[in-house]
Swiss-Prot record:
The lineage of its organism: Bacteria, Pseudomonadati, Pseudomonadota, Gammaproteobacteria, Enterobacterales. It comes from Escherichia coli (strain 55989 / EAEC). CDD domains: ZipA. Belongs to the ZipA family. It is found in: Cell inner membrane. Its main location: membrane. This is Cell division protein ZipA.
Length: 328
């Protein structure tokens, strides 16, 4: 029984709550609907009031113009003033009534447009009035009168500078380079030359005298005049000397007994022109130098005691040809 009562109370309470909620929603919607219905009316009324106020302002502005036309009807003007003060219902009539006189009011400004064109031609009349006032150019000629005085002063030194400038190129001796071809003619005048080669020990060492003597003799050199060795046309020492070998250390002489002899190097030289073909003699001289260097463990150097190069060999050959052509 208790459980049935609880269920009944719960159901009744739920129904009551639902009824209250439905009643609340219904009343709220009713109030909202009434509010929305009243708002457009209020808006319309407010708009009408605003329109009536604007029309009153327009009537007040245009009443002056309307009064001009109704000057003879004095009582009608008094009624219009009294009608303008009451409720806005009477204010809707003046705009319609004043709408007719407004059209002629807009026309007079159109009639005033032509007089505006009339003053325009008067403007060009004023422009020439400003144009004939060139009083300022009268001041400009005053300044050039002062300017010409310094201008000739500056123009005077300019010709002086120009006078100095032509003097400088006159002093420049440009034709002197013509004398350069003269030394070129001196080269073919060389009628003799000395071709020099050196066979030297490596840096910090010296050539052994006994090894040096054996290599010199194998190359065909024979001890002779001026206490140096000579390479003759024939290996037995007969015939003219083709080139010679001297000591690199001054005075350049040798001692035939070279067992205890040491030297940093020897010099081989050939005088051009020489007997026979100088180019062939030069090749024989180069072969002798290379043979001696290989035997004693030295190197072949040029006349400046630098490592012999193919370029230096061609230079020696060119010198030999030059001397041969000069003596031809």
């Amino acid at each position: 029984m208790m459980q049935d009562l609880r269920l009944i109370l719960i159901i009744v309470g739920a129904i009551a709550i639902i009824a209250l909620l439905v009643h609340g929603f219904w009343t709220s919607r009713k109030e909202r609907s009434s509010m929305f219905r009243d708002r457009p009316l209020k808006r319309m009324k407010s708009k009408r009031d605003d329109d009536s106020y604007d029309e009153d302002v327009e009537d007040d502005e245009g009443v002056g113009e309307v009064r001009v036309h109704r000057v003879n009807h004095a009582p009608a003007n008094a009624q219009e003033h009294e009608a303008a003060r009451p409720s806005p219902q009477h204010q809707y009539q003046p705009p319609y009534a004043s709408a007719q006189p407004r059209q002629p009011v807009q026309q007079p400004p159109e009639a005033q447009v032509p007089p505006q064109h009339a003053p325009r031609p008067a403007q060009p009349v004023q422009q020439p009035a400003y144009q004939p006032q060139p009083e300022q150019p009268l001041q400009q000629p005053v300044s050039p009168q002062v300017a010409p005085a310094p201008q000739p002063v500056h123009s005077a030194p300019q010709p002086a500078q120009q006078a100095f400038q032509p003097a400088e190129p006159v002093a420049a001796p440009q034709p002197e380079p013509v004398a350069e071809p003269a030394p070129v003619m001196d080269k073919p005048k060389r009628k003799e030359a000395v071709i020099i080669m050196n066979v030297a020990a490596h840096h910090g060492s010296e050539l052994n005298g006994e090894l040096l003597l054996n290599s010199i003799q194998q190359a065909g050199f024979i001890f002779g005049d001026m206490n140096i060795y000579h390479r003759h046309l024939s290996p037995d020492g007969s015939g003219p000397a083709l080139f010679s070998l001297a000591n690199m250390v001054k005075p350049g002489t040798f001692d035939p007994e070279m067992k205890d002899f040491t030297t940093p190097g020897v010099t081989i030289f050939m005088q051009v022109p020489s007997y026979g073909d100088e180019l062939q003699n030069f090749k024989l001289m180069l072969q002798s130098a290379q043979h001696i260097a290989d035997e004693v463990g030295g190197v072949v150097l040029d006349d400046q005691r630098r490592m012999m190069t193919p370029q230096k060999l061609r230079e020696y050959q060119d010198i030999i040809r030059e001397v041969k052509d000069a003596n031809a």
